[in-house]
């Protein structure tokens, strides 16, 4: 399945606080995702009440990105450290 993606304004709130090297990796991962979502370990975390899906992808070993999959488009809304990702996922479940 071919997926599209877009970055929400909320995504940039977290993105701007990342180190430059991680921002560069995030840009690389975004391009990789466009070509092949599996290449960034794209996965569905849970189905949301509205029928959309909460998803994640790997940026580096220590950083993840979160998005909502709706109508074959992922709207990325958060990026951060794996530790913060784990905390956020626990809160969302």
Where are these regions (language model features)?
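A short, surface-exposed loop/turn module that caps and links secondary-structure elements
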Residues: 31-57
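Non-catalytic, surface-exposed connector residues within folded enzymatic/regulatory domains
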Residues: 5, 39-42, 79
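Tryptophan-centered motif/residue detector
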Residues: 12, 30, 55, 76-78
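Short glycine-enriched loop/turn motifs at secondary-structure junctions
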Residues: 9-10, 51, 69-71
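Arg/Lys-rich, positively charged N-terminal/basic patches that mediate binding to nucleic acids
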Residues: 1-29
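Enriched for short, Lys/Arg-rich terminal
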Residues: 1-2, 59-93
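Short, charge- and proline-biased low-complexity linear segments
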Residues: 27-32, 87
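Active-site micro-motifs of SAM-dependent methyltransferase domains
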Residues: 13, 32, 84
């Amino acid at each position: 399945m071919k997926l599209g993606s877009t970055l929400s304004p909320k995504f940039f709130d977290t993105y701007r606080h990342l180190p430059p090297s991680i921002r560069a990796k995030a840009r690389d991962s975004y391009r990789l995702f466009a070509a092949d979502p599996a290449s960034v370990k794209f996965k569905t975390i849970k189905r949301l009440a509205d029928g959309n899906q909460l998803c994640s992808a790997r940026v580096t070993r220590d950083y993840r990105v979160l998005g909502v999959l709706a109508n074959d488009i992922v709207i990325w809304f958060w990026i951060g450290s794996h530790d913060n990702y784990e905390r956020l996922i626990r809160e969302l479940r």
